[in-house]
């Protein structure tokens, strides 16, 4: 980004050359071959075609690790790995999910769950995703300046799609949106989630955000289908492949924070967080819960969070 800022001369022929080894599947160099590929002329070198390399050693590596292993891709073939050692969701996993074809009709028996990520401001955008079983789609993404206007838009989406449950990011900007939705009568279906709050399985995950993102990875392995067309297809791919993870001193999985991602030059994963929020807690489909009589007579309100 610093380099691009200096290449703004109008009447100067500008040549920008980026050399590197494809050792990581994230970062600005990776995006020269993916998101920004149309802006660059690519030259790729396979080690086996270089005159000075030890062909016998390279052949042995291919035999030991396999032609399609990440080790051979990086050290021999000169192409990007499917996943870095610390990448939670690999590009290959996302690619497979984008090739699956599902419709809402295929998952009609599953609960409908809405995930709402509220932007903190700046370049971040608010995003809304709807998941039903293995099917998912984006409903909304936009820069949000007024919390009340965004709350009214969410109320419209809740009325239109009638999810069994909706989970909203309760960060700095999310709390007033949540309060407004409750005031509008959606308190029975919406639940606020703090990314830093304790995980349901706090023996395995540092916080709820780490737990939700790991659930997304499992959902993809289990057959989840991602959009393959439209701007949301590239947005969700970029987001899901971006965060890295590690295990803390207590052996709990911890997802890379948004602040650390920004230090690596990566934007906030707004779409990824919205999708992850659809895994915030188990949800029971409205039609699967029989009406129950309360202690004071009449029927109890539907509670989707019966877990």
Annotate each PLM feature.
Residues 1-85, 104-307:
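Short, flexible loop motifs at catalytic/binding sites
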Residues 91-97:
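N-terminal accessory regions of nucleic-acid-interacting proteins
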């Amino acid at each position: 980004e610093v380099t691009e800022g200096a290449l703004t001369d109008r009447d100067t022929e500008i040549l920008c050359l980026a050399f590197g080894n494809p050792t990581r599947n994230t970062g600005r160099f990776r995006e020269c071959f993916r998101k920004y590929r149309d802006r660059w002329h690519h030259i790729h070198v396979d080690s086996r075609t270089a005159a000075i390399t030890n062909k016998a050693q390279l052949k042995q590596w291919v035999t030991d690790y396999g032609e399609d292993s990440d080790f051979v891709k990086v050290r021999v073939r000169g192409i990007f790995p499917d996943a870095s050692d610390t990448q939670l969701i690999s590009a290959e996993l996302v690619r497979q999910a984008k090739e699956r074809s599902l419709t809402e009709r295929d998952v009609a028996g599953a609960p409908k769950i809405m995930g709402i990520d509220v932007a903190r401001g700046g370049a971040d955008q608010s995003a809304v995703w709807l998941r039903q079983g293995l099917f998912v789609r984006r409903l909304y993404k936009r820069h949000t300046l007024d919390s009340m206007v965004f709350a009214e838009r969410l109320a419209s989406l809740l009325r239109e799609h009638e999810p069994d449950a909706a989970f909203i990011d309760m960060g700095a900007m999310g709390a007033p949106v949540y309060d407004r939705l409750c005031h509008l009568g959606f308190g029975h279906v919406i639940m606020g989630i703090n990314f830093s709050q304790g995980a349901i399985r706090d023996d395995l995950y540092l916080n709820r955000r780490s737990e939700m993102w790991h659930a997304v990875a499992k959902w993809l392995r289990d057959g989840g289908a991602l959009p393959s067309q439209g701007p949301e297809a590239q947005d969700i791919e970029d987001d899901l492949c971006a965060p890295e993870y590690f295990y803390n001193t207590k052996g709990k999985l911890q997802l890379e924070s948004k602040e650390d991602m920004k230090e690596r030059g990566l934007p906030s994963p707004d779409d990824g967080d919205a999708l992850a929020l659809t895994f915030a807690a188990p949800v029971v489909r409205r039609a699967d819960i029989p009406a129950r009589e309360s202690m004071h007579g009449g029927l109890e309100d539907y509670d989707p969070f019966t877990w």
